[in-house]
Curated annotation (Swiss-Prot):
Name recorded for this polypeptide: Probable ABC transporter permease YtrC
One Pfam family it belongs to: ABC2_membrane_2
Listed InterPro entries: ABC-5_transporter, ABC2_NosY/YtrC-like, ABC_transptr_acetoin_YtrC/YtrD
Keyword Secreted: no
GO cellular component: plasma membrane
Inducers of expression: Negatively regulated by YtrA.
Source lineage: Bacteria, Bacillati, Bacillota, Bacilli, Bacillales
Gene behind this protein: ytrC
TM segment ranges: 16-36, 60-80, 110-130, 144-164, 167-187, 236-256, 277-297, 300-320
Role summary: Part of the ABC transporter complex YtrBCDEF that plays a role in acetoin utilization during stationary phase and sporulation.
Family classification: Belongs to the ABC-5 integral membrane protein family.
Record organism: Bacillus subtilis (strain 168)
Intracellular or extracellular location(s): Cell membrane
Keywords carried by this UniProt record: Cell membrane, Membrane, Transmembrane, Transmembrane helix, Transport
Oligomeric form and interacting partners: The complex is composed of 2 ATP-binding proteins (YtrB and YtrE), 2 transmembrane proteins (YtrC and YtrD) and a solute-binding protein (YtrF).
Amino acid sequence: MVDRGLLYREWKQNQVVILLSIAFLVLANPLSIVNTYLSYQGCLDRQDPQYCDFIVNYSISNLIDINWVPGVILAVCFLGMERSKGTMDFILSLPYNRSQIFQTKFWLGGFVIVLSQLIGFLLAWLLILVYNPEHVYFFEHSSIGVIVISFMAFSLVMAAGALTGNAFAQLLTAFSAAILPYLIIALPVGNLEVVFGANIWEIFPSPESYFSLASNLSNLVPISYVVNEWLINSKYLLLIPAVMSMLFYLIGFISFKKLPSERNGHFFLWNRLDRPVQILVMAFGILGFGLFGYYTGHSIIGYILGMIIGAVAGFFVSYFSIYKKTKV
């Protein structure tokens, strides 16, 4: 599954990035506790103690909210940068099959992401015991949830890297996939509201039922987990990014194993994706710019002009992104 020779090669190739990722992920959680404690001590120095509370609340934005970033960087270094630099062909020429190569890259990154954050969780837990704050909110839920979400982000970018031929394409594809459910649902609904002059929530029994459905659908959008609003919901909500992680892993594994490497430098390794994706980009451009044009002046003329601009912009962006090969 994971070959030791490949593991050593990945370690030597990406040693600095791996060590920096480990350092950040290990320290992020305990540093959040230390920062809260120092803020409390600063309050005691400036004000009466009765106005100072030592409360650790993970629902307030803190450093671990960006723990997904190292996972993205690792995935780009493991696949996108290898393709952009032209070293992927050398790796594929080694006496290992593609399954071993992908599994080694994927599980090395996964191991770094999960184990580093578990160590950080343990250190933060020890600091809480030492500092003994008055209240601690969402510590376990947030710490474990961030591990799941950062692993999902890593899996998503790895899947994008297995489909694409350079680092830029990998990042753009990953970002597009992260917002794709929103684009598929929200843009058509918004345009229907403009065309028919009605609000979609009016067909629901109550505004509450509409907003409840919208909230539930947003849980299917990977990028929605970047902010920590999921903390106030059920802990079982984290099953969704966990399932997404496995789905992205399967997509990445199958794509890396089956797709040709001869198209390194191109946007997609599988050229049959070029045209459908270009059409999709143009459609999203038309719908998105159309809405922007309409809401700028609340006029149909603005809506039509926006759609025209969106079609042109979508065509050129997709053409120069997808059909122009990046030099490797």
